């Protein structure tokens, strides 16, 4: 029978519920417990796929093609659990499902209400997502007190009764703000947050208290007494310089023991050796490199969360401190590429919209002409093809039809047909809806023999996750290949171009990939493409005699 840990948050948002939930999952997994994670999002959007990165941050893509909350990325990076569509759902999805059932007559003419119909749908989805796990860690998005969260909180309250006391644990993350004029941490916001939860009918078993300094023993006792939890269950969560230290911090305070005791689980002792080794590698690098990250949303790095973490993972596995220099592509458009001169490698990530594209193309041109290691991901690959077409293949004005419909050389165009993960044919037109209409999820890619990509991956065939509508135009690909562009990877069956590179005698390391390799990187194994990229940056640094 699956047991549940429900994670809620109070006082303010963005306290790190996702990191706390992922860290608990990592500790429990090290004890031999099979865990999974769910994220319940109270917003009415169907998914974050069409939301602005400035509103929501990164959209994390799963193997089965779900566009999900970025917290699912944390769950996959911290544990071995694979996330899927069932692991993340929103108010929009819940209401959509209930309304469709009502239209089909499944409620037999009853008045459809929030309780029981919406809450029952939430409970059913939680159970479906938790199936097969020993422990399901369920994070409820938002902040206690928000009106949007109420149906979700009511649903988990009901599960607390229905599943039995030894099968459910409630963990509440809260904030203890420090008031400089008073010279102390304030517990009152936490007390009020717990009071809100208890009014709903949920009594937290564990309190995770975020603070920027150590919480005095007396304050912890006060919190325990006024919030009706055991003193040892008031866990101190101090700010850390790396999220990968959090599992160790929580384990030191016996969080996993408290959870196992509450859920009546007998398990072996936790072994966090792998996390300890990661921290050693992170804190004692042997090298340093500087990478230019040329993007559109660089003021909000949460938009590139998985990519930034993947670069950090590569640093861990190459014993390198990777210093990411964030550069706004619009600034490069206005001021030129001088800012790139002192850097060891250049990266252009995925993105949407025309704004800043010429700045990215200028950065790509600089990388190609100056033999600076270059990695282009999704749009970063497409713009590398555009730059090559314009400046090498003799196609002036070449562009993507996403940005210029009447370009004389549409080297990038809308994918009109492809096979999805199940082998079903997907079709799109320019008039298709924006939401949920991209080529999404895990896709197979065949790597060409003798290519750099093949040597990096060490395999003839790979599977990576996609999120895009546009692809290299096969009708113009032959001319690009004639001029020296190497198509290093293709999708079997459709022959879509998935990876490009330049010959070794032209450029030491120039790779573009249509997929998003960052979605499958984790701190324990890293990812071969990012590790190779950082090694290329180190080699470039050495060649320049730095």
From Swiss-Prot:
Which molecular function GO terms apply here?
Answer: ATP binding; CTP synthase activity; glutaminase activity; identical protein binding; metal ion binding
Q: Name one Pfam family in it.
A: CTP_synth_N
Is Lipid metabolism included in the keywords of this UniProt record? no
Classification via Gene3D superfamilies? 3.40.50.880, P-loop containing nucleotide triphosphate hydrolases
Q: What InterPro entries is this protein classified in? A: Class_I_gatase-like, CTP_synthase, CTP_synthase_N, GATASE, GATase1_CTP_Synthase, P-loop_NTPase
Q: What class of enzyme is it?
A: ligase
- Locate the active site: 378 (nucleophile), 516, 518
Positions of region (Amidoligase domain): 1-265
Which SUPFAM superfamilies did the record assign? Class I glutamine amidotransferase-like (SSF52317), P-loop containing nucleoside triphosphate hydrolases (SSF52540)
Q: What domain of life?
A: Bacteria
Residues holding CTP: 13, 146-148, 186-191, 222
A GO BP entry is: pyrimidine nucleobase biosynthetic process
Q: Name one GO cellular component term.
A: cytosol
Pathway(s): Pyrimidine metabolism; CTP biosynthesis via de novo pathway; CTP from UDP: step 2/2
Q: Which residues bind Mg(2+)?
A: 71, 139
Catalysed reactions, as listed in the record: UTP + L-glutamine + ATP + H2O = CTP + L-glutamate + ADP + phosphate + 2 H(+); L-glutamine + H2O = L-glutamate + NH4(+); UTP + NH4(+) + ATP = CTP + ADP + phosphate + 2 H(+)
Which positions in this protein are listed as binding ATP? 14-19, 71
Q: Which residues bind L-glutamine?
A: 351, 379-382, 402, 469
Keyword terms, alphabetized: ATP-binding, Glutamine amidotransferase, Ligase, Magnesium, Metal-binding, Nucleotide-binding, Pyrimidine biosynthesis
Q: How does it assemble?
A: Homotetramer.
Query: What protein family does this chain belong to?
Result: Belongs to the CTP synthase family.
Q: Which purpose does this protein serve, as stated in its record?
A: Catalyzes the ATP-dependent amination of UTP to CTP with either L-glutamine or ammonia as the source of nitrogen. Regulates intracellular CTP levels through interactions with the four ribonucleotide triphosphates.
Output this protein's name: CTP synthase
Please tell me the species this chain comes from.
Dechloromonas aromatica (strain RCB)
Please state the gene responsible for encoding this protein: pyrG
